[in-house]
Amino acid sequence: MLTKRQELILKTIIQDFTKTHEPVGSKTVMNQLSIKVSSATIRNEMAVLEEHGLIEKTHSSSGRVPSTEGYRYYLDNLVQPLQLPEEMYNQIGYQFDQPFNQVDEIVKEAARILSDLTDYTAFAEGPEDKNVSITGFRIVPLAPRQVMAILVISDGSVKNQLYTLPRHISGDEVEQAARLINDQLVGKNLSEINKQTFEQLYSSQIVGKNAPEFLELLESVIKDAASEQMYVDGQLNLLNNIENSDLKAIKSLYELINSSSLAGELIDLSDSPSHYPVHVRLGAELENDLLKDFSLVMAEYSVGRYGRGTIALLGPRHMPYSEMIGLMEYFRQELARKLLDYYGRFK
């Protein structure tokens, strides 16, 4: 356990390093401390911090830099969220103050705003709502043998996919299939639609016999509607935060964050303490060597009965944590407010 003075010195080292990205010496610490301590005493205390593995020496300087353990101690015990500058509050409000037609548009915009504000890579996952249901299914002709399948969800979102009709299927048969699908699926929660539902439709003489490919299309549209949407923005910002120029590593990292399933696993908060609104995982804790020099700042937002979602920032390990935690605490509330405003239109 550290003394109060040792904690203050560790906090000073981390805050200075996240600003300058340069090793921190005892004189720098002495000039920034809020208490009067001699340089010799600070050197002794820094030696204790080094023995605990909380700071480490670099080869190129006599100063010290925080270790992963040092950052973790700071995040668990010392960090305090900073209030955002007034202009940043205004910027967030201004960029959210526009008409949105779907939940996905709001979530996608959230990722873009976060990335623009921080110059980091931002993730935004839409709220997972187990209670949304199908309110309509339509087939719209576009060309002689091309139609669009449109699925309307109770939260106001719309999913669609193009479908090319096989030559043996007539327009009347497609309309019959659409009517049957409406009868079977409209009003059902997405969470209730499963493999058995589609097996029943496949066994139908109208749908399964004449348009099995059409059912595959429908199944694809429904799976897309039921899955939480993940949006990533600022991928190229990774290049500013990669400490080596290994092209293979850069490519692998880019592929990692652009994979919805892998990104979803990355920002999964299921094993994080629920009493913290914002969580930070350091590179060594992310269980992926590609991310060892990064940190992930995550926050969950809630839109009541409409579900919960997650936002996250992927940036360098030496990011200014107080500022980023303060930003995420505020942003998650603003995103939830915007989504609740949207859902309120469908009451």
From Swiss-Prot:
Q: Which Pfam families match?
A: HrcA (PF01628), HrcA_DNA-bdg (PF03444)
Q: Which Gene3D superfamilies match?
A: 3.30.450.40, Heat-inducible transcription repressor hrca homolog, domain 3, Winged helix-like DNA-binding domain superfamily/Winged helix DNA-binding domain
Which InterPro entries does the protein's record reference? GAF-like_dom_sf, HrcA, HrcA_C, WH-like_DNA-bd_sf, WH_DNA-bd_sf, WHTH_HrcA_DNA-bd, WHTH_transcript_rep_HrcA_IDD
Taxonomic superkingdom: Bacteria
For whether the record's keyword set contains DNA-binding, the answer is no
A biological process term (GO) from this entry:
negative regulation of DNA-templated transcription
What keywords are assigned to this protein?
Repressor, Stress response, Transcription, Transcription regulation
Any GO molecular function: DNA binding
Coiled coil start-end: none
Q: Which Cys-Cys disulphide bridges does the record give?
A: none
Keyword flag Kinase: no
**Database matches in SUPFAM superfamilies:** GAF domain-like, Winged helix' DNA-binding domain
Q: Which family does it belong to?
A: Belongs to the HrcA family.
Say what the protein does. Answer: Negative regulator of class I heat shock genes (grpE-dnaK-dnaJ and groELS operons). Prevents heat-shock induction of these operons.
Q: Which PANTHER family match?
A: HEAT-INDUCIBLE TRANSCRIPTION REPRESSOR HRCA (PTHR34824:SF1)
Please give the name of this protein: Heat-inducible transcription repressor HrcA
Gene name of the encoded protein: hrcA
